[in-house]
Amino acid sequence: MLEIKNITVCYGDRPTVRDFSMNLKQGQIASLVGESGSGKTTVIRAVLGLLPGGGRVSEGDILFDGKTLLQNTPMEWRKLRGSEISMIFQDSGAMLNPIRRIGDGFVEYIRTHEEISKQEAWKKGTAMLEKMRLAGAENIMQSYPFQLSGGMRQRVGIAMAMTYDPKLLLADEPTSALDVTTQAQIVRQMMELRDTYGTSIIVVTHNLGVAAYMSDNIVVMRHGKIEDHGDREHILSHSENAYTRTLLDAVPSLGGLRYV
């Protein structure tokens, strides 16, 4: 479904990700793990064509359903983002206008993807919150971002990202700004998306415990390169990579969830 083939990402002449490859099948969850600055977020931004500041894929290719993404026109990207590939951020509150109601932001998001009335879009947004099992969907739509907890804002962000049932969901540090109990809830919700809708997910995280609990495959990154990779069992139990073992030793608890 997604094939990243030996990509190098550069800003100017400086490579920040070098010779990165991974494959993701339909319904799989993969995690990119590593310290800040290791290139994790750069990889998923390259997949979505959202590299900032003149960043570019200088080598390699990215294939989605067998088609290269690197030759997409702006119109092709607009059709793809949100419908086929969607993204949630570290703090979904950052993508919500603080002086507008949740519902107004949801309506605007929906109407960028289809030509329907504001009333129809409001109903669709409310129905999506209900589909994601958020209690009091209408009250949430009427609320401002500051009136919701960080965990609830994140769940709203997930609901928005899933509105058009994308095949691929990219999650950039979706739990790092949350307390451990809420982290566990968000992790479970993303796993339910995979189980219910067959959504493929790439999770960027510095927490190997989160990755180990929810992932089929794990890629450990360091200094813009792949340091280690393999399925969950290999990384947890059989990896002999010193950096991977250091990350495992630093794993905190996750709201009572065990990763081994």
List each model region and its residues.
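Conserved ABC transporter NBD signature motif
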Residues: 56-68
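A short, proline-enriched helix->beta-strand linker immediately N-terminal to the Walker B motif
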Residues: 163-167
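ABC ATPase "signature
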Residues: 229-230, 238
